């Protein structure tokens, strides 16, 4: 399928590597101007330089740590205040792994900020311009765990399910503005995150 996203601006979270990086690349190759968001400057620079050579747009990046909501919110709010975003891809690294018995309330709070609070904060800022332009696409990268919880991923199971419910509520509230909200329930992909989770689980069994 040939999709043209020329004149569209996209913001892609967690896009220095893994699925986020793959999504950012495909959006850029489809004609969108892409702003990549992640912690690793070196990886972001490499990707942006590559995409700038492959496409007609001048792509950008933001260095943000999703684990620090206060700093993240300042950077992302300033960017969205000065830039129009048509396509928002909410994606970030997963929270700490572990079963219910191994987690503290502090762990739950950190996971809430990482997966839910950041998603809501970014989306609500981006929505304003989408509503003004009567066009917007919001996509949340979640997990198959929202359908069937995965073992040793108590935090991810809980917080991603919250994102799903919130996204459905949001779609009901803003759909009349021609702004759509969708969730992608990702499965098992050969990424560094999956290797990390497998290693953590193996250690817990020894």
Segments predicted by a language model, with ranges:
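A glycine/serine/threonine-rich, flexible loop-to-helix segment
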Residues: 176, 188-206
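Conserved glycine-rich Rossmann-like NAD(P)H-binding loop of the short-chain dehydrogenase/reductase
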Residues: 32-46
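Residue(s) in the substrate-gating loop at a strand-loop-helix junction
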Residues: 143
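Substrate-binding pocket helix/loop in short-chain dehydrogenase/reductase
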Residues: 99-100, 104-112, 194, 202-205
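Alpha-helical segment proximal to the catalytic Tyr-Lys
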Residues: 128, 172-173
